[in-house]
UniProtKB/Swiss-Prot annotation:
GO terms for cellular component: plasma membrane. The lineage of its organism: Bacteria, Bacillati, Mycoplasmatota, Mycoplasmoidales, Mycoplasmoidaceae. Pfam families: Mycop_pep_DUF31. SUPFAM superfamilies: Trypsin-like serine proteases (SSF50494). It is a lipid-anchor. This is Uncharacterized lipoprotein MPN_592. It is found in: Cell membrane. A lipid is attached at C23 (N-palmitoyl cysteine). Keywords: Cell membrane, Lipoprotein, Membrane, Palmitate, Signal.
Amino acid sequence: MGFKLKGFGFLTLFASQAFLTACSATLTVANTNHKNESDKFVIFEPQPPLSQTIPKPEAEPVIEPDAVATPPVQNAEVQIKPDSSKGVYSPGFKFNTNFIPKVNTKYRPGYDLSFALKFGTSWKEAYGTGWLIDWKDVKQDNKFTAYLATNLHVADSLRNKDDYKPYNKDGNQKEFLPGDITTEFSLGKYIDAQTVQKLTPEYQNLKHLNNRNSDALVSIQTSKLPKTAYTATDFIKTAQYKYNHIVSNTVYELDLFQNAVSYADFAVLELELNLANNRDQQIFDSFINPAVTAYEKLGNSLGLFSNLQLDQYVDDTHYLLGYPLLKREKTSYWNLPQKGYSSPLYENSNKEVSRITRNIRKDDEIPGSRLVQNQINYLPFAQNDPKGVMDFSKYLNYVFNYHEKQYQHHGYGLLLEDTDFPGGSSGSPLFNQNKQINSIYFAALPSKSYGVSQILRATQNKDKSKNYDLIFGDSNTKKYYAQFAKEHKTHLYHQILQSNDEQFRFVENDQTVTSQTPFKS
């Protein structure tokens, strides 16, 4: 995500020199020169006094071409348009940006499903990446409900008083602080010039806006704030993490989760679009509907997610695409607010935007990432872990505060060679060479240029006591997304009903109350 997160022991893995940096980003509105670059799961958010009034001009699209009018092209018939699928490389940044992948290529699934997320309060913006995981099939009058997967630490930026319980209050069930309440939400995507023109017809006669003829990052404000559909908090049965520890012939019980509730860095947001609203209709037509089509072609809900033995991930190539917050440079950018909406004036918006990025590097241009195979040299307690896999439950100070409630990281992650994406990329889906999602990107280990992702389904782990499935559930997972999907009759649940495969049908026999609180009572 893209802001500096609050004071975590998240950064240090015991005595090792490994520092995990959460890939999110935050900008303060009042002090735009103080941007938290890539956050280190140490959130530092300088809050201005709430009494300060930030100028809020009447809403107009923030249009940021590279900014001078261009003279007419003389021999236009011989102009050859650059191949937008190749992208560009910027000085000082090794990854490929500003591209639209060709159909049927390895990065196309990530492009089709993924979006730039922006959360705004009265004094700051937070950025992350999200992707379409589900939607409601049932036709609703002038409504469409989409579900976007992202990281838990990205979803932490949503403080919506009208959210589902218990997410409408903090983790101690207290009201959110006024300055933390989310006031606006935008969905963005890097799109081709033709779609840019379709979304900005009212500006077609403004000749100086030459970026209407360019591929661009377009961010559109929604008419309503999202709600929280699912958080991977208190998601695992932890009884098996109690051990007898013998010291001087005395037996002590060691409970790894004695002082904190488990979490995985995964969440799902519900976004209801009002199709009678022009901006929401634009989001549906240009962002969500194409994603639905791509999702179905990728194998739909039951074919989209991989489910491997932990020692098999090392054989795969992993493709990452997300929207880190980077210097704008030659990136055309449109910010389309709701009609009549007064939004803060972001002075820094001409310097940094969410730029589409993939793990192709300037020095070799070999697509994708392989897993680290010698993590024992950098991480303690990794002796028995499969190559490239990290067992988060071994690192007791790897904790996170979601809505002011502390949780301890659990589950398994992938350690990716040379994949240290900056803030704003948190929440990006990681695809394998078979175009299946295996995990969700959430952090970087900058000292080694490693990226880290959270495995979503670990049901075939040979250590059966540590199985989990954040999507479809299993006997060791007490809180998973399919519970919400069943309760709300979503597309993913309808897909489950059509399957006879037991790996997807656990929710049908699960008697767990789906509206359970994620907070320990």
